[in-house]
């Protein structure tokens, strides 16, 4: 099986695994994930944080965004652009729309834009990941092109335990992350 075929299989399995979580498991796992990230030094020290609006069963970082704003941090969100580019945008109160791929996205004209080198922490979704911080995304390479430009940021993946694989199928151009935080339901 080629790397492309392996990625497709891992992507499909990871999406199915996260969608298979019950509402209770998802709620508990999201809460645990956000609490773990909030306890990290990189979160405590960060001023500008790139989050994402959860889509298709992704780990939901909404509680983290609320807490970041409460602490005076600046939560930004990715906006997909031409040429598979990303822009980090801090939306205003009426600055949201449904963007590419049906994802809730900031409206650039109503948002403050942060340069990649202004970000202190970047939280990245995935469909599958492994123990050595490699990830399989949705397949367009947006984050793989963006992350190298985030020169001072800690880059963390956010996912559910059910999305873990033994070895993520990656190519040379796939960006390795600094770590992963995993949502695990607990009793």
Each language-model region and where it sits:
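A residue-level signal for conserved active-site and pocket-lining positions in enzyme catalytic cores
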Residues: 14, 51, 75, 123, ...
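N-terminal active-site beta-alpha-beta segment that forms phosphate/nucleotide-binding
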Residues: 2-118
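Short glycine-rich anion-binding loops that position phosphate/pyrophosphate groups of nucleotides
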Residues: 55-57, 127-131
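Internal, well-ordered alpha-helical segments in soluble enzyme and binding-protein domains
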Residues: 10, 33, 142-143, 176
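Conserved beta-strand segments that form the floor/walls of ligand-binding pockets within enzyme
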Residues: 50, 102, 122, 128, ...
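Surface-exposed, charge/polar-rich loops and edge strands
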Residues: 1-5, 16-19, 107-108, 117-122, ...
């Amino acid at each position: 099986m080629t790397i492309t075929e392996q990625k497709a299989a891992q992507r499909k399995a990871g999406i199915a695994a996260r969608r298979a979580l019950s509402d209770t498991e998802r709620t508990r796992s999201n809460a645990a994930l956000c609490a773990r990230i909030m306890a990290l030094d990189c979160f405590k020290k960060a001023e500008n944080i790139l989050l994402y609006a959860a889509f298709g069963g992704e780990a939901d970082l909404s509680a983290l965004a609320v807490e970041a704003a409460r602490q005076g941090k600046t939560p930004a969100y990715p906006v997909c652009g031409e040429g598979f580019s990303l822009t980090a945008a801090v939306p205003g109160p009426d600055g949201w729309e449904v963007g590419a791929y049906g994802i809730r996205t900031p409206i650039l004209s109503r948002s403050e834009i942060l340069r990649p080198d202004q970000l202190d922490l970047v939280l990245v979704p995935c469909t599958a990941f492994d123990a050595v911080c490699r990830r399989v995304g949705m397949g367009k390479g947006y984050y793989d092109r963006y992350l190298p430009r985030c020169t001072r940021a800690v880059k963390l993946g956010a996912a559910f335990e059910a999305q873990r694989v033994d070895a993520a199928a990656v190519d040379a151009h796939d960006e390795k992350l600094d770590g992963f935080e995993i949502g695990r339901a607990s009793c």
